[in-house]
Amino acid sequence: YLIAAAGIVLCLVIPIIIRKVRFLSEWRILYGIVGIVSLAVVVVVGRVSYGAMLGFTVAGINIQPSELVKIVFVFFVASSFKRSTEFKDLVVTTVVAAFHVLILVVSKDLGAALIIFVVYLVMLYVATHQPLYILAGLGAGSLGAVAAYHLFTHVKTRVNVWRDPFGTYDNGGYQVAQSLFAIGTGGWFG
């Protein structure tokens, strides 16, 4: 309960601090470096868990830097777009964002990579109002999804389970099938 209480307090206090502290937008380079270094540490010293390198252990405490990086990444992109939305600056920000995603893909943390990618696309659109950037991003994301399907067996397994949860009931489809049973029995609202 102590951790939950601390989390609630942080959720209430941090927005107030962010509104009061204007200099946070000047640390974009620090945000980019912290994000990339945090993810790179996992690639170097991380332990493999269920096929992915998600974190490491220090003094018996499991640390998963990708959770912190999701927040730091938002600060990085926001401060970069506040500084400039000229095309050359967008390219630099996109390269740094792509490096974040690439490190996550190398460590097989595809869920975090997808979150970072989608967050970047949404923030890019909000900052520039250019639908072409969204279309290009969706095209690149589609190519990445096809590549992930062919490169990672666990992605292929998940797609097959999604396509036929009852055919793969004993080999990965159990949870999907049970959720379909629950929806069929109780509907969306139980």
Region locations from a protein language model:
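Hydrophobic alpha-helical transmembrane segments of multi-pass inner membrane proteins, especially
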Residues: 1-175
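Oxyanion-binding "anion nests"
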Residues: 175-190
